């Protein structure tokens, strides 16, 4: 058996939607393949396909925020030069691009540490449907708390502290568990930290870039001959993830400005509870 083009497109759509909407892409990429009976030609193809899906969403966020990324790169180079000029702190206070650059650096550290130290331990949970269901419930709770207790504030980049970035980064590190939404946890942390709603989402998406890129790089070594099997399906999934991912970013940025994220909390609770119930019925708990 081999993954079909239709199955690949479905999984690409799922990845594109759930990577940026706060409902956990890892959970859906565990559950959906079982629902549509995906069979890979070999383990290498599974790794190759997963890597391409993540590269698709990586390109989506880069394409959407390319102007911000250019400013961030310029800010990084300029702030490094500021160190030698003795103007590093002044630059962080006066230049939003420099400040955002280092807020992203600080926010990335916890996930990088968690990935190095805990990835193998959490890898086994991707085959544990009960764990996926439980962590989906937790994602729903995070979204509910962030909306009910705070719902965001009025902090802009210039007011955002490195402590805020570290806290958001720690929440992102929790997303190493399947079912904990990376975007959901970071947006929730941003709202609880008092960030403007749109900034919380924007910072979350920019913070995704090094994390998605890092995860893809880690998987590259395990691809092997995976790219040689049914290349058409792999490309179809990649393109679906890219296109839908781009549209999902646009959708969430619009939603977070105009509406509550509670609908995603309810969704996570429903899917999480259903997963736990089915796991219990089939003796998987």
Question: What is the predicted function of each stretch?
Answer:
Residues 1-285:
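Multi-pass membrane proteins that catalyze or facilitate reactions on polyprenyl-/lipid-phosphate substrates
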């Amino acid at each position: 058996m081999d993954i079909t083009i239709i199955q690949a497109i479905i999984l690409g759509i799922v990845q594109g939607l759930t990577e940026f909407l706060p409902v956990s892409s890892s959970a859906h990429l565990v559950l959906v393949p079982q629902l549509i009976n995906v069979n890979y030609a070999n383990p290498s193809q599974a790794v190759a396909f997963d890597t391409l899906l993540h590269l698709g969403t990586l390109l989506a966020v880069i394409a959407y925020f390319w102007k911000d990324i250019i400013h961030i790169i310029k800010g990084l180079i300029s702030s490094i030069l500021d160190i030698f000029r003795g103007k590093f702190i002044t630059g962080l206070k006066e230049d939003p691009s420099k400040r955002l650059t280092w807020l992203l650096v600080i926010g990335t550290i916890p996930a990088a540490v968690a990935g190095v130290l805990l990835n193998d331990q959490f890898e086994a949970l991707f085959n544990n449907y009960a764990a996926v269901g439980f962590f989906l419930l937790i994602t729903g709770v995070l979204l509910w708390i962030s909306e009910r207790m705070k719902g965001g504030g009025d902090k802009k980049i210039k007011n955002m502290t490195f402590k805020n970035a570290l806290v958001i980064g720690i929440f992102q590190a929790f997303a190493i568990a399947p079912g904990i939404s990376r975007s959901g946890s970071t947006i929730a942390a941003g709202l609880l930290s008092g960030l403007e709603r749109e900034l919380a989402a924007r910072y979350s998406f920019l913070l995704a870039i090094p994390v998605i890129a890092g995860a893809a790089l880690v998987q590259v070594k395990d691809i092997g001959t995976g790219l040689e099997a049914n290349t058409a399906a792999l490309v179809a999934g990649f393109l679906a993830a890219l296109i839908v991912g781009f549209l999902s970013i646009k959708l969430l940025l619009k939603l977070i400005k105009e509406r509550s994220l509670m609908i995603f909390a309810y969704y996570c609770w429903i899917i999480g509870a259903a997963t736990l119930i089915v796991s219990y019925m089939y003796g998987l708990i």
